[in-house]
Amino acid sequence: MIPIPRMPLVLLLLLLILGSAKAQVNPAICRYPLGMSGGHIPDEDITASSQWSESTAAKYGRLDSEEGDGAWCPEIPVQPDDLKEFLQIDLRTLHFITLVGTQGRHAGGHGIEFAPMYKINYSRDGSRWISWRNRHGKQVLDGNSNPYDVFLKDLEPPIVARFVRLIPVTDHSMNVCMRVELYGCVWLDGLVSYNAPAGQQFVLPGGSIIYLNDSVYDGAVGYSMTEGLGQLTDGVSGLDDFTQTHEYHVWPGYDYVGWRNESATNGFIEIMFEFDRIRNFTTMKVHCNNMFAKGVKIFKEVQCYFRSEASEWEPTAVYFPLVLDDVNPSARFVTVPLHHRMASAIKCQYHFADTWMMFSEITFQSDAAMYNNSGALPTSPMAPTTYDPMLKVDDSNTRILIGCLVAIIFILLAIIVIILWRQFWQKMLEKASRRMLDDEMTVSLSLPSESSMFNNNRSSSPSEQESNSTYDRIFPLRPDYQEPSRLIRKLPEFAPGEEESGCSGVVKPAQPNGPEGVPHYAEADIVNLQGVTGGNTYCVPAVTMDLLSGKDVAVEEFPRKLLAFKEKLGEGQFGEVHLCEVEGMEKFKDKDFALDVSANQPVLVAVKMLRADANKNARNDFLKEIKIMSRLKDPNIIRLLAVCITEDPLCMITEYMENGDLNQFLSRHEPLSSCSSDATVSYANLKFMATQIASGMKYLSSLNFVHRDLATRNCLVGKNYTIKIADFGMSRNLYSGDYYRIQGRAVLPIRWMSWESILLGKFTTASDVWAFGVTLWETFTFCQEQPYSQLSDEQVIENTGEFFRDQGRQIYLPQPALCPDSVYKLMLSCWRRETKHRPSFQEIHLLLLQQGAE
């Protein structure tokens, strides 16, 4: 039972993101450094209102750079009532900016200047400047409290801009210096503004008001909105229920802009979109609400007109009717084909299908046109094709895309080479270390040490500081969020004992990338928890395996003909798990072990069977699993009873309990206080079963074994509520919905996993403690629902990121109705962020024993 080779966890999160992405820009992953710290923004594109000296010029205002005198410093002290000093960055093209990082002037310990606050002004064309405001109208952002730390601030809402000015703010006269970085990505939509009627208010039957205005629109707002961008381009799609929102601390209806039918005299809402250049449009995607029970539906048809530069609107429109949906109230993206029409402006008329129409996002799929075409359809005689030799369309976006594609190809080739090289050496090592079994099925194991490393060394060689990529990728921690590498490098801290006993995906030391010499955070790997027969595998550290390898294990051979197969419990890639009845098992079991069955009665057993066509690696893994299972001797752990290995298929025979697994057992029962005549379970019985689970896990942790899939589905129930921990719940189709599958290979029980297991691939006894807390929660809810049943798999991973950041936004499982405060307090202690602050299984077991005696 050892870990199977892993894939980078980043691929999981990227797959989740790519699989669910609907918008052109996803703010959760659009968090790349744009080139201040890496040097990709040239000095001439960094300007300032003034400078103290040549050594504190604007070009020295780069995050993590110590060049010059260590930062940009304005000529005079900043006054609270005279905010005229600024640092300006020209990004050359429009960018979607989601995050700002700032530092003061450290200068090797000689600098003390920093900006405690700042404002942001931005422009898309260099002439009209806009003051950034958050969702509540506040303009001032928190800055630094010392000259050396990097302070990262999310822009909520994000901005679309080419020019950005950072304006230092103080509450008293003081000298300030700044080093900055902007984070985001290229704005591929090319949209520079949209004009639309102002959103309206929806009054619920109870009198509550839902504000459906575009609250972050950065243009002029009156009865209509002109020359700006806002919520329709912020990359955030609204929920099915428009009264709910993704965002924190905002009002109901924030995600949507909505209009009432009676406000439109012609039965439609007209929105005009202006773009940065003439573009070739493929599709338009509109995210609409369809909560028809409240009179909200998607539009029934749309007509779009096109215009190139300053010409008139073309008479030929794109018309697209829709089939209305009165069955599914889910919000959805509506894709409108635009038939490769060319234009720099589009005017669309969205026709009402009901009382209300609500949009949360509008995106366009397009490419920059390589020549000026009127955009009319070829068959239209009313709009002849023209060509203006004086017009040159800037194709910088195209060059950037080509460069990115070439870079991606080289990266993929490098990854393939690394994977092949790793597999080659893995096979060589396996051949060198694998031993053959003797006639008594003796297995000797010596596994390489598995540990996690976090490179906090900031020094780097000159060769390591060279970077040719335009952007250094900040890998996502969840589908909707990622932290820049400069920040998260400091965060994970684990006690030495946990690192020694942990079983994790091997985390490679981070390699510095970029002139700043700051190492990227070490990438975690996906750990495949499945064994060859489909069940989860225990994680056994190298120290423990070295102790086991010195002992010969003789396992009794069981006559295969005595196995009476009843049903298949589950299956894996190379084997199956069957429920069988056997007679005469007493002759083959250990003398110190008593079967939980009456004399001369058939015994229920679980038989793990390896298929005859399994490869050599699978056979060795199966035999290693027998080696480990044979050492587990505890009243609350499933025992290995016998094996069948004289011929194929190889089998191992383990205990099974007459009441099946705890999940099914509890779901068939009700609390004792219930008035129902159905089977009941008392609170004392629940506590008794939980205590046994803790006892079994205490035994495993004493051996430094990590279960990695502790849940009620992996706890078997015998007579008198006895519990034994098993390991084949993962193989059962019945519980396939409890696991998230990645690329058809690894399956992860993410709803039971700790944040460090999901994000760092790290499995320790502390991560088993987390899973025990979830198992305890299942027990006291009588397994009536899945943990976090209200969240999708992507949202569960998103919540994991909240545990990582620890900003008070994480969602905990609620206290079950039958659960006393003392037990729920125990659950919460199992879900503490820091692994060293979680209780041990010895402490948990003792606490449950004490509570049971009260």
Curated annotation (Swiss-Prot):
Disulfide-bonded cysteines: C30-C185, C73-C177
Gene Ontology biological process: biomineral tissue development; cell surface receptor protein tyrosine kinase signaling pathway; cellular response to angiotensin; cellular response to hypoxia; cellular response to transforming growth factor beta stimulus; chondrocyte proliferation; collagen fibril organization; collagen-activated tyrosine kinase receptor signaling pathway
Effect of K608E: Abolishes kinase activity. Reduces tyrosine phosphorylation by 90%
Regulation: induction: Up-regulated during osteoblast differentiation (in vitro). Up-regulated in cartilage from mice with osteoarthritis.
Regulation affecting activity: Present in an inactive state in the absence of collagen binding and phosphorylation by SRC. Tyrosine phosphorylation enhances the affinity for ATP and the catalytic activity.
Phosphotyrosine modified-residue sites: Y471, Y735, Y739, Y740
Family note: Belongs to the protein kinase superfamily. Tyr protein kinase family. Insulin receptor subfamily.
UniProt protein name: Discoidin domain-containing receptor 2
The species this protein was found in: Mus musculus (Mouse)
Side of membrane Extracellular, spans: 22-399
Disease note: Defects in Ddr2 are the cause of the smallie (sli) phenotype. Smallie mice show distinct dwarfing, with reduced body mass and reduced bone mineral content. Mice also have mild craniofacial deformities, such as protuberant eyes and snub noses. Smallie mice have a reduced life span, with about half of them dying within 6 months. Matings between male and female smallie mice do not yield any offspring. The levels of circulating steroid hormones remain at a level corresponding to prepubertal wild-type mice.
Annotated CDD domains: FA58C
PTM comment, free text: N-glycosylated. Tyrosine phosphorylated in response to collagen binding. Phosphorylated by SRC; this is required for activation and subsequent autophosphorylation on additional tyrosine residues.
Residues bearing carbohydrate: N121, N213, N261, N280, N372
Function recorded in the entry: Tyrosine kinase that functions as a cell surface receptor for fibrillar collagen and regulates cell differentiation, remodeling of the extracellular matrix, cell migration and cell proliferation. Required for normal bone development. Regulates osteoblast differentiation and chondrocyte maturation via a signaling pathway that involves MAP kinases and leads to the activation of the transcription factor RUNX2. Regulates remodeling of the extracellular matrix by up-regulation of the collagenases MMP1, MMP2 and MMP13, and thereby facilitates cell migration and tumor cell invasion.
Assembly, per entry: Binds hydroxyproline-rich sequence motifs in fibrillar, glycosylated collagen, such as the GQOGVMGFO motif, where O stands for hydroxyproline. Interacts with SRC. Interacts (tyrosine phosphorylated) with SHC1.
Membrane topology, as annotated: Single-pass type I membrane protein
Tissue localization of expression: Widely expressed. Detected in lung, ovary, skin and in testis Leydig cells (at protein level). Widely expressed. Detected at high levels in heart, lung, skeletal muscle, central nervous system (CNS) and kidney, and at lower levels in brain and testis. Detected in chondrocytes in tibia growth plates of young mice.
Residue ranges that the UniProt entry lists as topological domain Cytoplasmic: 422-854
Record domain F5/8 type C: where: 30-185
Major site of localization recorded for this protein: membrane
Active site (record annotation): D709 (proton acceptor)
